[in-house]
Regions:
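A residue-level detector for conformationally permissive "hinge/kink" positions
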Residues: 1-2, 105
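RNase H-like nuclease fold core
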Residues: 2-43
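RNase H-like nuclease module associated with reverse transcription
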Residues: 33-152
Length: 152
């Protein structure tokens, strides 16, 4: 299970998108860094974060398969419905022409039923704690969820 998020300009001094990715339930991993590409929109930035998350989850899926011989579908949460729509919709739209076709790796994973992407309300997005200046109480709540493996 993974959580993917991005933020533009939320951190002092950054003028490019930050992304954060959290994986939990068993293996815990996270990272927060500036994106390697210049996104032309917030949707593209969210989609880039989804791409990196999907690649990591695919690696984890293969590791689980090698260790247990069980195939599992990975679940990835994002708080951007437009990014979900782009990932799930094969129809070309003029408004998304700037999104690089190599990013459609996510579509292939969805089509092969190796990945499911679900919307998660921004207030429940635990990856926000890595990209945004949240109130202390919200950050503590997110950390408790991450480290206790409790459900959202």
């Amino acid at each position: 299970m993974g959580f993917s998020n991005s933020d533009w300009g939320g951190a002092e001094g950054y003028k490019s998108f930050l992304e954060s990715i959290i994986y939990y339930h068993g293996t815990i991993g996270w990272r927060s860094h500036k994106q390697k590409v210049v996104a032309l929109s917030s949707v593209e930035a969210e989609y880039n974060a989804l791409l990196e998350s999907a690649q990591d989850l695919e690696w984890m899926k293969n590791l689980i398969f090698e260790a247990t011989n069980k195939k599992v579908q990975q679940l990835l949460f994002t708080d951007n419905q437009s990014a979900i729509s782009i990932a799930s919709n094969h129809i070309y739209h003029h408004g998304t022409r700037h999104i690089n076709f190599c990013l459609h790796f996510i579509r292939d994973l969805i089509e092969q039923q190796n990945l499911k992407i679900q919307y998660l309300d921004t207030n429940k997005m635990i990856a926000d704690s890595l990209t945004k200046n949240n109130p202390y109480s919200k950050s503590i709540k997110h950390l408790r969820i991450i480290f206790s493996n409790q459900d959202l």
